[in-house]
């Protein structure tokens, strides 16, 4: 089989302005590593649990205390999950408390040429801060930050730590560096194994 890469469009659901990323990853990437790519590309801090949902099948980190949980994402590739479920699009849930749901669409598959590491192609919109309270908390956060007369403006500004937060602007260079750093880390590990 010829190695291939896949372009994914990742959209954070239930937020405005739109938060979207386009990434390229090896089709054989383990879902646990895809989670890491999404964390870097979105700007999340990998502080919470996650789960991929393909049709009615969940992939994440199993918890023995919960019995029937998700299939172990560390043992399943994106390719095998897609083949097994027939999914062409799927969901990625991050932070079960805040409930950040992402819609992921497989846009295109290409033969791998050269590097097979993850790449960030496009970034639109600023990822919400961690622990802001999900889509509804984020909406309130943006309203309070934008309005100096808002009763929670000062508190939100202090919590955010920045007065120049722009929900519409993605810091592409910072996000791209985070994805590139992952690719470099994984390449070093692969070289050490050979």
Swiss-Prot record:
It holds the Pfam family PRiA4_ORF3. Keywords: Plasmid. It comes from the Bacteria. The keyword Acyltransferase does not apply. The keyword DNA damage does not apply. PANTHER family: LEXA REPRESSOR-RELATED (PTHR41878), TNPR PROTEIN (PTHR41878:SF1). To A.rhizogenes plasmid pRia4B ORF-3 in virA region. This is Uncharacterized protein y4hQ. The lineage of its organism: Bacteria, Pseudomonadati, Pseudomonadota, Alphaproteobacteria, Hyphomicrobiales.
